[in-house]
Structure formats: structure tokens, C-alpha cells
Amino acid sequence: MESADSGRSDPVKGDDPGPSFVSSPPATPSRYESQKRRDWNTFLQYLKNHKPPLALSRCSGAHVIEFLKYLDQFGKTKVHVAACPYFGHQQPPSPCSCPLKQAWGSLDALIGRLRAAYEENGGRPDSNPFAARAVRIYLREVRESQAKARGIPYEKKKRKRPPTVTTVRVDVASSRQSDGDPCNVGAPSVAEAVPP
């Protein structure tokens, strides 16, 4: 005599392997996500090494600017000082002793990644030090000073506007009825359809 559940195995005894899931390897993060994580860890390390050590919750826009200035020592962009004979030259003919700094574009991208990382790690958007007005002003000043020093104007990208569509208004009362064609009633002439 066979029991009703003889085809089933007992999960308590362990002879049922259970549902089989094919585990896929964890998805590799995008280049942006990897860079954002590295930047975030670098900033946290900076706060840890700060004298005195600084908690993230007490971090302000001033600390972010201090961090950006600290990063200048690792920069690779030659920024001429006002007294340099090559100030304002894009392609100086010979080397000079002007400092290397972080390029404005690199700092701007870094702040964007850190702003996102701050909120992803539990920070409130209204207290985000990377979104502080002082940081935006600092970045604008860096952009303008580097543009002058390197002779490279930074211009905002102009948005392409969609082509304008010209509408033609047809006046039915002034349509041609002179040729007697009933199909031509209300149809504009070519001259009427083209705007002046």
C-alpha cells in the first residue's frame, strides 16, 4: 500500500535537495560606480587623517574645499601664475616653474561623484557638504582662474534647439473658385501656402 505522498521526499530528513538556484557571479560595478567608491573611500580616509580627525556628520563645505586643495598636490595640469611670462598661453614654448594642479574638470566630476556617494551612504540631501554653495563658488573660481592662466576659455555647451515648425493658416473664404472645379473649393494656391 502506497501512501499519498510517497512521491515526495521529506525535507526534514534532508533527502529533498530543494529548489535548485543557479548562482550567477556578482555583477561587476560600472567604471563610474568603481570610481565613485574609490573617491568616497579616499575622502573618508582624508577625514580620518585630518588633524583633529573629523566625523562625516561634522563635515562642511569648507572641509570639502580643503580636501580639493589637498588634492592639488597630486595634479598634473600646469596652471601658470600671473607673474609667469606664459600666463594665458595655451602652448608655452618652454617649461616654467608654475605649479601642477588638479584640472577643473576633474574636480567638478569628483564633486559630482562624492555628492551622489554621500546620499547613497545615508546622508541627507539638505546637509550634503558636496552640494554646499561655497563648493560651487570655489569650483567656479577654479574654472575661471585656470581658463585665464592656461588661455583656454571654458564655454557652456549650447543646447541644440529643435527646428521650428512653420504653420500655414488657410483662409477658406479666399479660396479659388474661379475654375469651377468643386474639388478645388477651399484648397489654397501654392502662393497662399508658402509663407512670405
Curated annotation (Swiss-Prot):
Sequence ranges assigned to domain ALOG in this UniProt record: 31-158
Annotated Basic and acidic residues bias: 1-16
Segments forming a coiled coil: none
Keywords (A to Z) from UniProt: Developmental protein, DNA-binding, Nucleus, Transcription, Transcription regulation
Cell compartment(s), UniProt: Nucleus
Motif (Nuclear localization signal): 156-160
Protein name: Protein LIGHT-DEPENDENT SHORT HYPOCOTYLS 6
PROSITE patterns per UniProt: ALOG
Biological-process GO terms, alphabetical: mRNA transcription; post-embryonic plant morphogenesis
Annotated function: Probable transcription regulator that acts as a developmental regulator by promoting cell growth in response to light.
Keyword Nucleus: yes
PANTHER family, sorted: PROTEIN G1-LIKE2, PROTEIN LIGHT-DEPENDENT SHORT HYPOCOTYLS 6
GO cellular component: nucleus
Keyword Cell membrane: no
Superkingdom of the organism of origin: Eukaryota
Record lineage: Eukaryota, Viridiplantae, Streptophyta, Embryophyta, Tracheophyta
Family: Belongs to the plant homeotic and developmental regulators ALOG protein family.
